[in-house]
Amino acid sequence: IESKFYSDFDIKLNINGDIKYQLLPKPHLLISDSSISIGENNNKNISFNIKNLKVFMNTNNLYPKSKINFEKFEIQNTNFFIENKEYSTLRNYFHNSESKPIYIKKSKVFLIDDNDDTLIISPIEKINFTTSQQDNFKKLNIKGNLFDLNFKLFWKKKYNSKMNSQIEIDFQEPNILIRNELNYDNNSSFEGTTSLNFLNQNVEIGYQLK
């Protein structure tokens, strides 16, 4: 299960609790206690402890065990503690992984500074991460709350490109819309455009680093 999970999601899974097979709402494995790790370098791994991890399976190919295919996994009611130094690892995962769908619901994200103090607590209603060769895009959707403001975040990049991405953040009450498009020439050279729409006023800024 652990090796297949890594193969399908590019995430390391350590199972520490019981595993139950459940049919509803769709066939899935319910893992009572586990941890997941993102990143190939042990010094830059991000690890999270997960209770009641649901790993959904392809119903057309449940047996034999050696041919089980996972379709997606789902996490609920989990606190994610992320340090400043771990941001680049997360970014690299979203940009470079070829994971099957990931769903996170009713959880919280804690951003921690270098002194182990909590900078931000963001309640998250849902996070969906999908990669698809069919429409040629990787997509990240987040719906949550930040500084008592409800927001929706949408990020996408071309599936076969590591250099271009787009992000849109929509805050509600007050209505603030931020869009950013980033184009990399290489790892150290990029250009982009950021636009801010607030009170029916739009400001657009272009930038580049060579």
List where the protein language model places each region:
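Extracellular/lumenal and peripheral-membrane lipid-interaction modules
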Residues: 1-19
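Disordered, low-complexity tails and leader-like regions
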Residues: 1, 24, 31-32, 53, ...
